[in-house]
Swiss-Prot record:
This is Leucine--tRNA ligase. Keywords: Aminoacyl-tRNA synthetase, ATP-binding, Cytoplasm, Ligase, Nucleotide-binding, Protein biosynthesis. GO terms for cellular component: cytoplasm. It is found in: Cytoplasm. It comes from Pyrobaculum arsenaticum (strain DSM 13514 / JCM 11321 / PZ6). The gene is leuS.
Length: 945
């Protein structure tokens, strides 16, 4: 541990103890006081929280602390998510003696060997990391109200979740039925993002299976995402070296890759009859079930047996890979199906030739495929003459009937409509089917098993596909603030594709499903409205309510205002006054003002949060804001246990101290960006914070009582402007922007001031105290120390936001002085050996104000000599918007007073003594005839060497 880190750790411990003793972060509802209620995602205690969690919690804490300075009652609570399989899976691995897991936990999290032996018990493991994570949050300086802490397996919480689920069921939003889900074969249970390694959400997609059959009736099911192109098939592909099987699948005998047979076994009945190499089937002919044409099966090593069924249909007119492969073997036959503006009859051929692709192994084929598929899906229309390809093997009138159907629903239709039609038609005609797959595979369960798709028959689902519910969810997204704003599109997209989602399991920790024995509500379903529970749990404990008293009537009254306290009291035995108090506390805190989490939770938790709020609460209780931050890398690499580069939050605090760590997580990237945490940056920020502390010490020791000078007023004004920018940044959740202003820009302003004055003034101390208030959300421990050092009363965490007002004249004075220094340095005579600089000022500021409108006549009318008016107007025109606006805001400006105030500063900048005269003063010497050169804001300059 470095001395710098030790200093900040001790500072943190000092102020954390004082905050806890004063209970400053335990707010009570206060009539007439505005509130701000913010939450961040509660962690799974299956391991210690790391700096990625720390970033999310820091952003929430910054907002919480900022809103306290605005005079609001701020509630920032925290809890722990015990539900589901993450804890159970790790505990099982430890109990089974999994050396990798044991080694990781000892190396990364520093778990002692004697503790590891106890962690085969999932509840022991959860409580261990629960307490470790809580300590880390406290050491990190989070302003959390710990009186509302809970776990998701507390009996009171379980009653709350059961109430929520009964509400959803009564609204028809929980259903039971057949649906594909991500599935862990080892544990025989559905999985979501929080059950997988790296929290990867299984993306379930749908292949259309098209049944091509050989002359013996053996089916070769081609798996495709583009079933509308089946009319253009000229051959089939199979990997000759691949492992295949002949199997019975749902009563049909077919050829599948061995991997596909395994995956399909979770979706239907699969009976493997025999195994075979792919080469056995190369050379056979199969019949296209739509056109009746017989096409050959070719061998191709590019076919991946793990994708789809391992049987691929070839459409060279519209698939660049197929075109290139068939060109290589000299077997191209093209059947045009889709018209796309900007392409000829054969889009695949056009793109392959335009991109000069030489063979089927050319990497550019990937880009070519994306281009063709995207263009055809977005703008493509099926050709009218494709009808002639349909049903050539069928007798009349069957063929005419099928052609009529295709003419009506397929020919001339946009590709997306044709695709939907033919998928349904193939299934209904018994010529095809559906295969579900993990499209972003491989995805692994936390136990290490690869996830598959299983079609469940009697599973409980939350039906996020319900159209009216989707519309309500979209309405909330439209109304609420989303940070970053561009994430709104992702929320809308997620709402569109969400469908039924398995909400209960037969395994894991959590809340029992109230109406179906043996089912446990899963972790992404019991964590959607728990923010409301924070608002009432303190009251539940204060009034010593028992879990069995927390009935439907209790929750209906507290959250929805159904019934009266007296009616609910009669049914629950809870005193009416207690009910009224709990209801009033909920009414005070809700709705939630900000929900903070990582951007990876947009496709699941954050969208479920939206859905469940609109389903259960009235509109006035819908949440107001979501903040979704980017990921955290470490030294340019993704953190992972396998790389041993995960940095637990408590270790990071020990390495750098809380405030340097907070500053680094705040300043290294804007909220929506991924943040690369670097050691060198953390050390640099620690040094910068230390320099702020040293500055505060100097101010406390050397400040003097005196009338404020131009320099003092400039300091106040510059910091006032900076604090306006900081406030705007905080309000817009631009945390990095605020941190840059606070740690570096304002420090530079103070450094410039301290260089220019012999001793700082008491006004400078007051300005530094204002800085400490604004700095507090990012570096609260240092801010408290600075505030205390400078004589601030109470805690800075409770101080009101500073009300500094910039003085335009003081700002103009500094801009003017810097312009003069720059003008002197541009003169050829300036350089080494200068003995003195003499400045002649023209005191007629009214001329400058008249010149602002860029009109020479106006300047002359204001008294400007005609021979100077044009020069003055041109000068003012070049000053820039900021200086011009300051001139407009200032009634009168004394250049001589400004220069004399900044005399030390100017002399240091020029490296020579400086004398200042008024050009109109007849007693002043006219050195070099420079008096007549003086214009307002542009002195005459004489340099003596």
């Amino acid at each position: 541990m470095s001395e710098l880190a030790r200093f900040f750790i001790e500072l943190g411990e000092k102020w954390q103890k004082r905050w806890a003793e004063a209970r400053v972060y335990e707010p009570a509802p206060t009539l007439g006081v505005p509130k701000f209620f913010i939450t961040a995602a509660y962690p799974y205690p299956n391991g210690a929280i790391h700096i990625g969690h720390g970033r999310t919690y820091l952003i929430a804490d910054v907002l919480a602390r900022f809103h306290r300075h605005l005079g609001r009652a701020v509630l920032f609570p925290m809890a722990f998510h015990y539900t589901g399989t993450p804890i159970l899976t790790i505990a099982e691995a430890i109990a089974a003696g999994d050396e990798t897991v044991v080694e990781e936990y000892m190396a990364i999290y520093g778990v002692p060997e004697e503790e590891m032996r106890k962690m085969g018990d999932p509840l022991y493991l959860a409580r261990y990391f629960h307490e470790q994570s809580k300590r880390a949050m406290q050491k990190f300086g989070l302003s959390i109200d710990w009186t509302r802490e809970f776990t998701t397996i507390d009996p009171e919480y379980q009653r709350f979740i059961q109430w929520q689920f009964e509400k959803l069921r009564k609204k028809g939003l929980i259903v039971r039925g057949r649906h594909p889900v991500g599935w862990c074969p080892r544990h025989s249970m559905p999985v979501g993002a929080h059950d997988t390694k790296d929290d990867k959400e299984p993306d379930i997609g749908e292949w259309t299976l098209i049944y091509f059959a050989d002359r013996d009736g053996l089916i070769f099911p081609a798996a495709t995402l583009r079933p509308e192109t089946v009319l253009g098939v000229t051959n089939m592909w199979i990997n000759p070296e691949g492992e295949y099987v002949v199997a019975e699948y749902d009563g049909r005998k077919m050829v599948l890759s061995r991997d596909a047979a395994y995956r399909l076994s979770f979706q239907g009945s699969v009976k493997v009859l025999r195994e075979a190499k792919g080469r056995e089937f190369v050379g056979r002919e199969v019949q296209n079930p739509v056109t009746g044409e017989w096409v050959p099966i070719y061998g191709a090593k590019f076919v991946d047996p793990k994708v789809g069924t391992g049987v691929v249909m070839s459409v060279p007119a519209h698939a660049p890979y197929d075109y290139a492969a068939l060109r290589d073997i000299g077997a191209i036959r093209l059947i045009p199906l889709i018209k796309v503006e900007g392409y000829g009859e054969y889009p695949a051929k056009d793109v392959v030739e335009r991109m000069e692709i030489k063979s089927q192994t050319d990497p550019a084929l990937e880009e070519a495929t994306k281009e063709v598929y995207s263009a055809e899906y977005a703008r493509g229309v099926m050709r009218e003459d494709v009808v002639e390809l349909v049903g050539r093997h069928l007798p009349e009138p069957a063929r005419s009937m099928v052609m009529a159907v295709f003419k009506m629903y397929f020919a001339g239709r946009p590709v997306r409509e044709a695709r939907e039609f033919i998928s349904k038609w193939l299934a209904e005609a018994g010529l095809g089917g559906v295969m579900y797959d993990i499209m972003n595979k491989p995805v692994y369960c936390r136990c290490g098993t690869e996830i598959v798709v299983k079609v469940l028959e009697d599973q409980w689902f939350i039906n996020y596909g319900e159209p009216r519910w989707k519309e309500l969810a979209k309405k909330l997204v439209e109304e609420m603030t989303i940070v970053p704003p561009e994430a709104k599109a992702q929320f809308f997209a997620t709402i569109d594709w969400l469908d039924k989602r398995a909400c209960a399991r037969t395994r894991g920790l959590g809340t029992p499903l109230p109406w179906s024995h043996g089912w446990v509500i899963e972790s992404l379903s019991d964590s959607t409205i728990y923010m409301a529970y924070y608002a009432v749990i303190k009251g539940i404990r204060r009034h010593n309510l028992r879990p069995e008293q927390l009935t439907e009537e209790f929750w209906d009254y507290v959250f929805l205002g159904v019934g009266t306290p007296e009616e609910v009291s009669a049914k629950t035995g809870i005193p009416a006054e207690a009910l009224r108090a709990i209801r009033e506390e909920f009414e005070f805190w809700y709705p939630l003002d900000s929900r903070n989490s990582g951007k990876d939770l947009i496709p699941n938790h954050l969208t479920f949060f939206i859905f469940n709020h609109v389903a259960i609460f009235p509109r006035e209780k819908w949440p107001r804001q979501i903040v979704a931050n980017g990921w955290v890398l470490r030294e340019g690499e993704k953190m992972s246990k396998s790389k041993r580069n995960v940095l637990p939050l408590d270790k990071a605090v020990e390495m750098y101290g809380p405030d340097p760590l907070r500053a680094t997580l705040a300043i290294s990237a804007e909220v929506e960006q991924d943040l690369d945490f670097r050691h060198a940056e953390a050390v640099r920020n620690a040094q910068q914070l230390m320099s702020i502390y040293t500055l505060a010490q100097r101010l406390a020791q050397s400040a003097e009582d005196r009338e404020p000078t131009w320099l003092d007023r400039w300091l106040l004004s510059e910091v006032a402007l900076a604090l306006e920018r900081v406030r705007d940044a905080y309000e817009k959740v631009r945390v990095r922007q605020a941190a840059v202003e606070l740690l570096y820009n304002i420090k530079n302003i103070f450094d410039s001031y301290m260089t220019a004055v012999e001793r700082p003034s008491r006004l400078a101390v007051e300005v530094a105290k204002a800085w400490a208030v604004a700095l507090e959300p990012i570096a609260p421990h240092l801010a408290e120390e600075v505030w205390s050092l400078l004589g601030g009363e109470g805690f800075v965490t409770s101080a009101k936001w500073p009300q500094l007002k910039p003085d335009p004249a003081a700002l103009l004075a500094r801009r003017y002085v810097d312009m003069v220094v720059e003008d002197v340095k541009k003169i050829p005579a300036y350089g080494e050996g200068v003995r003195r600089v003499v400045l002649y000022i023209n005191p007629n500021f009214t001329w400058v104000k008249a010149a602002l409108n860029n009109d020479v006549k106006s300047a002359i009318a204001a008294g400007t000599p005609p021979q100077l008016a044009k020069r003055l107007v041109e000068l003012v025109r070049t000053l820039g918007d900021e200086v011009r606006s300051l001139i407009a805001a200032v009634e009168n400006f004394d250049e001589r007073e400004a220069l004399l105030s900044y005399k030390n500063y100017v002399e240091k900048a020029l490296g020579a003594p400086v004398e200042v005269y008024t050009a109109e003063d007849p007693a002043a010497p006219d050195l070099g005839g420079k008096k007549k050169a003086a214009l307002p804001l542009k002195p005459g300059i004489f340099i003596e060497r």
